[in-house]
Amino acid sequence: MRSRARTHVATLLLSAVLASAALAVGGDPAHARTPSPSPSPSSAFRPPASVDGGAWSSGHLQGTAIDRRRGHMYFSFTNLLVKTDLAGRPIGSVTGLTGHLGDLDFNSADGRVYGSLEYKAAQAFYVAIFDGSRITRMNMDARTTDVLSTVHLREVVRDYTADMNGDGVFDGDTGNTPDHRYGCSGIDGVAFGPGLNGRGGVRLTVAYGVYSNTTRTDNDHQVLLQYDVRDWRKYERPLSEDALHTSGPASPDGKFFAYTGNTTYGVQNLEYDGDSGNWLMAVYKGKKAAFPNYGLYVVDGSKPARRGEVKGQPRPESGRILSLLPRGLHHEPSGVYGYESGGQYGLVSLDDGRYYVAEAGTVDSGGTTLQTGRAVLHRWTGAVPNPFAVRGPAG
């Protein structure tokens, strides 16, 4: 990992420039400027208005990530990773994934792409780590090339397989059960950002998927795990789907809860915004009538997690509770704040008030349905119900 001193100096030198640029853009007072622990983008970086991820015989678009220095965009299509340049020209792809590849984020410290990878039938959950510099051609097999390594997440397995009703039977991949602690269906959202406990340092944050279930009360939080990945190379193993490994940290460095109400499969896309210091959680809407069921929730990064009640659990439980940003739409009965917006298929902050919000679709090609994806440049306005506005590359 690059030295913390170099990162700190870079952040200090660029923070004033970023703040001035952000003030020129304007926006919601909730978009409070706080220093980012991540290296700031170069002022010379001019993002295109959109980046086309192509059309593929694959699963639908799950997430996106950008390597600004090299000018590359990465698209996760469930069982396929696609690498393009910023003009949308394909550079390479990774195939051979039979698990569920979800959200992505780029780690500027080691130049690699991190994503969530699930094998629910095998009760195995991983962080997939792609070496983008080695993705140089199309259709590179994840199992037989050296582009991918994986780290096992034991904490997720424990919560996913929890026998909550004590009948001695794990009911498997279904939401129609009291099993799965917190309603855990696996993992999806991933993002790099500061420690949620307010102690600083860059962490990889992994968000749970959460089954939709309107009959239980213990599934109304978004659950976020944080990991310090600086020593993860000792855990990394190649992907072998015939013999899934369990090499990984015994527990996370932190476990946090955000009270939003139940959603449909939890945080689809998680993103840290270095401009505001906040965390964005894009979700598929929930179905509980007691909650507003927004599509986007924002964790207030200015407030460290506090010890409090994890509501609705079978037995009283305390945990590290995160605060939602008190802006946007407000549902008074539940106390939940949020917005209505996209981002469920990909969300990338450029740390200056601009975001790439992904769009997913389909196209017919000779009778075959292909999945498409496109990252579209937006700016944060803080308006309700949708806080994003489409923005071209120039302003």
Regions found by a protein language model. Give the residues of each.
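Residue-level signature of beta-propeller blades and closely related beta-rich strand-turn architectures
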Residues: 79, 118-120, 133, 153, ...
